[in-house]
């Protein structure tokens, strides 16, 4: 174990004394399985491919547990690691680890003799109490109230309670980025603690027993301010049986709980008990990464462990201005290479698109994912092209227009259209099956009918409004949106007119008015109302009296033809 040198500031421990594992040099071509055999035989915690490239045994063991022993161990290696002499002081080691290195290699007598892993070095726990106390505004004050209350409640029950994840990250970023929900972790029974919290706040608790978690909704502060959603969980470890599968959970400490998380910026916790109020737990250097706006995974298989983290990462990059580091991009390339993740349901993938569409700029998020090649998770043959990016840009313009015109659109449907429109039909069909989008929705997302409608609207130089409505009205919403995405300016203008005005047009006359004019109950009533509606669209009738005159003319014509008796 690493020596807790920080507890004795008068001692300048050397790098050799801080080493927490041996290293062994291996050929780059070895598989994970063969590398593990060699490491176990040498009782080494790290494998070396060069003086500055190494992989951790724990990462190789994780890969082997997923039947990925055939991978090259180098796929899980960290390149360009710092190398220090064994006589280097602890301060030098800490400086390298604080700079973002996952481990430091130690050299003595011209050869590498060991390593110091970042998570093995104790760090001082700074206090964020002053930041918490400066929170202001109704929403922030209600958060502060519940944080103090749960800390006191936990301390009275002998349980440590922490706020974790996004709240801590956003607290460090600045109040302007605050999200509405709170995530609490209890070292103990989180569900039982949630029930007590529901009693205190009058909220409704939804329990997810399989994961030891609960969600509180509808809670109020003593002055009646809504608390928003509060998620409560037991501190837990997770084991992924397969890449992309939902994890198996086991009780764990707070430190272990933080180690299972996606990114370092989310792997922080703030203690809430009165005796430790505001103390930051940051074993993975998240505070430093927040300060440098860096997005860093906790291990090379993080994105393969849970590929939905790729979509989450794009949201953080777009909304928070975080920059993925090289380790993220290596983990991304590995995750996309590993395959289709059959253990991950299509509903989870669609759920990620739905979450993206709630972001301030969802189209930027989707464009990032396109550039990263992330939609190969839907199908290995998915291709990201300039045309795909152009469709996203047009979709953004359509949503901007719809917002201004007060027209409601299905954002997820539009996103799927924009992302699949230019894929080969077999690829698009496989993507829809992967996403569990079934008929008839899958048929409606076919690009061919949309292209036909766009051509019809683009090519006709003159169309009466009623003719435009006749062309568009029978068409399902995905086809109309697809026609807007692929059509020219004329088609887009006509579709916008229909969505904003033509779709909702109704005659002033009712069915009773039509029957009073002598039209018998039945299909002819609906036909008469359609005629009046089209006349109204074309500006040929404006008042109820105009409609009565037109209806009288129409019924006489039917009578003369013998269609109305």
Predicted regions and their residues:
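Catalytic cores of the polymerase beta-like nucleotidyltransferase superfamily
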Residues: 1-45, 58-565
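Acidic Ca2+-chelating loop motifs
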Residues: 53-55
